[in-house]
């Protein structure tokens, strides 16, 4: 990547060209695989060799775990266009679901694993300061030999007492025993990231292996029980379901077809 001296009033132009914002450095940058020539007015004049080296880097497609279930199932062609040509549908879930995820994580993260389910071995949930906010796999290859990376933000990561690991993803949804299978590629993708860790902007994803438990914790809205002023108590039914088996080979097949 190449960091840029992009002023605030030109950030939209930079973003439209494919520039990305690094929150830690508080600077815009040209991601690997994006031609830096269009960004030259924000690059120091003595960086000519760096620009040439950067432009030789092949673009690596990054796939989010959630896209491998939801986005492909909804519109395969849209998924292809977004990853291959950068054409986005901007069909994102409402922000309220992200807020629900944060509230749910905050409630469970300091609890014992048995608080969620007796099916889970004894262990603890890794805290926010033990994991990067966003995690990335190392460079992986599909069945056609094409490079890709998996990049995402997990909900709950478990370290069991025997130093094996688990991942739980939150879903606000109708409870079903089939939910883990419905989100199987997302769950397997998170496990694959931790077992084949890479880095984002020099921040390394830790190696957590083996991952032995993959599960969905479902929240099904039931009723409002009490109201106090402009606040109310919303009751949810909970459903916990595990993915029966790891499906790494099927994940690679899925990426290849995508």
Where are the language model's segments positioned?
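Metal-dependent nuclease catalytic cores that hydrolyze phosphodiester bonds in DNA/RNA
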Residues: 47-162
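Metal-dependent nuclease catalytic regions and adjoining charged, substrate-binding loops involved
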Residues: 52-65, 197-258
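Short, mixed charged/polar active-site loops
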Residues: 147-151, 164-165, 229-238
